[in-house]
From Swiss-Prot:
Record function comment: Transcriptional regulator that specifically binds DNA of heat shock promoter elements (HSE).
Family label: Belongs to the HSF family. Class A subfamily.
Post-translational modification: Exhibits temperature-dependent phosphorylation.
Low complexity compositional bias, start-end: 397-415
Source taxon at top rank: Eukaryota
Record field: compositional bias (Basic and acidic residues): 374-396, 448-475
Protein localization: Cytoplasm; Nucleus
Keyword annotations of the record: Coiled coil, Cytoplasm, DNA-binding, Nucleus, Phosphoprotein, Stress response, Transcription, Transcription regulation
Name of the protein: Heat stress transcription factor A-5
Length: 475
């Protein structure tokens, strides 16, 4: 009871400016003789006290005086009031104002402020430390913002990537479905023999043959716009484009076959003489004249882009689509395409198996036949030059006389026949019985000899160019 009263008194005194309650309680506990076995004044000095048995001190005395049993907390309290440990070997503490028998000196002992005080407000930090902390906070805020932006971009990229992956998966699935359908269709179609046969035929067909059938081209040198085709040449208005069309028609894969039909044997005499006599020779044919067949030939020419061959009747030009791929003929194949077309109305034996040379004998070699034909053309060229000179002289002397024009027109077709003495050309160029009426009818159409000769001369120039092109193709 006395300890409790002393504690209350010390608390009251401390509250009025006296010693602290902790100091008063500690003094009474040390000064009590009943506790000398646990805690007492030091034997060497009255200015210190010793805790002899600290386990019992914490278990029995601390709860009675300080309401706790923590010995470490009691030591910290002593340190706050300036007590120090004197002997490291035992728990002995001393203070200059804590002396035995001098209780009044306790008021001089004051509690020291702790190093880390919790009573300071946040604004009490120094300015330099506060600036450092603010900079650190700002830096961390920027890093946080950057991380959030990177995270948002990553989420956007991930979303776009997922969309692309889904689209790719859909496309792959569609491709697989199409492939499955194609395989099923091919399996079903392969069971159809007609479909397989068509595929085999398409594979065997060459693109060259397909182009040859699909392209629509006219024969080089043919003029389908002139009404009087019986008395004019096939070179009249298309001679300027014959070279280009011939080059387009000739193909490398058909050069061997077309060479026989486009032999460089066409000369100006063939163009002039044969074109002027084309209408006369219709009556010389042993089969007679067939105007129905001639009309059919003229109507069919613009529609057939393939090669033309002589009909077996010998009176008209008949189109043959299969001639493009048929084997080359032996005799008339040596003649040019233009010559064959021009002489289509003549009475020729198309089925001859051999050619005729200059002496009327057969020629087995096509090269020798072509050479002989070129020699005959040179002879006719010379006759054409003579005919041109004579016509020019007659036109200069009697330019204003209609009778002179008629005489020149009548002499023009007869000049080559007097010069040519070759048996090969006699069958085409020699006058035959029964042609006088046809000649009179055709002479009425050739009133302007000068115009015809100029057109024939232009046709000759273009035919020579065609012949040179064909010779280059042969090489």
């Amino acid at each position: 009871m006395e300890v409790a009263a002393g504690a209350r008194g010390g608390g009251a005194g401390g509250g009025g400016g006296g010693p602290a309650p902790f100091l008063l309680k500690t003094y009474e506990m040390v000064d009590d003789p009943s506790t000398d076995a646990v805690v007492s004044w030091s034997d060497a000095s009255d200015a210190s006290f010793v805790v002899w048995n600290h386990p019992e001190f914490a278990a029995r005395l601390l709860p009675a005086y300080f309401k706790h049993s923590n010995f470490s907390s009691f030591i910290r309290q002593l340190n706050t009031y300036g007590f120090r440990k004197i002997d490291p070997e035992r728990w002995e503490f001393a203070n200059e104002y804590f002396i035995k028998g001098q209780k009044h000196l306790l008021k001089n002992i004051h509690r020291r402020k702790p190093i880390h005080s919790h009573s300071h407000p946040p604004g009490a930090l120094p300015d330099n430390e506060r600036a450092i902390f603010e900079d650190e906070i700002e830096r961390l805020s920027r890093e946080k913002s950057n991380l959030q932006a990177d995270l948002w971009k990553s989420k956007q990229q991930q979303s776009g990537t997922m969309n692309q992956i889904e689209d790719l998966e859909r496309r792959v699935l569609g491709m697989e479905q199409r492939q499955t359908k194609m395989i099923a269709f091919l399996q079903q179609a392969s069971k159809n023999p007609q479909f397989v046969n068509k595929l085999v035929k398409m594979a065997e067909a060459s693109s060259i043959f397909t182009d040859a059938f699909n392209k629509k081209r006219r024969l080089p040198g043919l003029d389908y716009s002139i009404e009087n085709t019986e008395t004019t040449s096939f070179y009249d208005d298309h001679s300027s484009t014959s070279k280009q069309e011939t080059g387009n028609l000739l193909n490398q894969h058909f050069s061997d076959k077309l060479r026989l039909g486009l032999c460089p044997a066409m000369t100006e005499s063939n163009i002039i003489t044969l074109s002027t006599q084309s209408s006369n020779e219709d009556n010389r044919s042993p089969h007679g004249k067939h105007p129905e067949c001639d009309m059919m030939g003229r109507e069919c020419l613009p529609l057939v882009p393939q090669m033309m061959e002589l009909s077996d009747t010998g009176t008209s030009i008949c189109p043959s689509k299969s001639s493009c791929f048929a084997p080359p003929i032996s005799d008339e194949g040596l003649l040019t395409c233009h010559l064959s077309l021009t002489l289509a109305s003549c009475s020729m034996d198309v089925d001859k198996s051999q050619g005729l040379n200059a002496n009327g004998t057969t020629i087995d070699n096509p090269t020798e036949a072509a050479t002989a034909t070129m020699e005959k053309d040179d002879t006719i060229d010379r006759s054409f030059d003579d005919n041109q000179k004579k016509s020019a002289d007659s036109r200069t002397a009697d330019a204003t006389t209609p009778r002179a024009d008629a005489r020149v027109a009548s002499e023009a077709p007869a000049a080559p026949a007097a010069v040519v003495n070759d048996k090969f050309w006699e069958q085409f160029l020699t006058e035959r019985p029964g042609c006088s009426e046809t000649e009179e009818a055709s002479s009425g159409l050739r009133t302007d000899t000068s115009r015809e000769q100029m057109e024939n001369r232009q046709a000759y120039d273009h035919s020579r160019n065609d012949r040179e092109d064909v010779e280059q193709l042969k090489l």
